[in-house]
């Protein structure tokens, strides 16, 4: 996602050249404090709107990644309050607005132009509206419909979900909470103040939800940027497949149908480079295989290097939608 931001800056998505009539030029020069507002009233409204949406997309994505990085670093250091306080904005607010932008660009711009303080406050959106926006964004992605709008809403917004992130967001920002039984601060306690940083229970309940939200975020950002940048949807689809393979290995119970499918597709390509012993991707070795692109042979002990993206290309495995697929 950071690479996409660099590509966007290099492509001059933030600038444009326009030819205005003499009357439009006079209006533009007479209102130097609001050039965008003036341009929106000219014959170049469509171009100006595209420029403004590009600015919004880039600024929101950059801000989201800044908070996300610092939040994840804080969690890795077991600074729970700081981590969840920082993650609240990118996951609860920014990601929702980017979802709306991908789902319905016209509606997003209408609300943005009329005043975000009125139409874009989170409290203005009911749960069913949020789910509808998430569904629209999922449908508009470059990749297959892999995510659940209900699960996203319940994870990020539902304060009655004991396994969601919404409770932790509130507890990290407030010493005392009382919304419901799940959120109510216990007697003789303050939220997180007396939490033992060595306890791992927070990671057990939140990392699966964070991983799911981050995969969704990747789908949103790549799909939005594809509207203005040339993006290889097959490459994106293979990256998402790798993410889901690791996610299944780390967080899903029982056997993984996805790993079985990958093993079958790779076939004879998956073998030791020294003794040619066939390899099988299992939950125990899948994270290292897909992230480090290596697997240790149980027969000879050699550590074989595998070019994962090349293998996926040879096996024709990808979660990308066909190029001619229209949103359903």
Set out the residue ranges of the language-model regions.
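Helix-boundary capping/turn motifs
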Residues: 59-67
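Short non-catalytic regulatory patches outside canonical folded cores
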Residues: 46, 50-57, 69-159
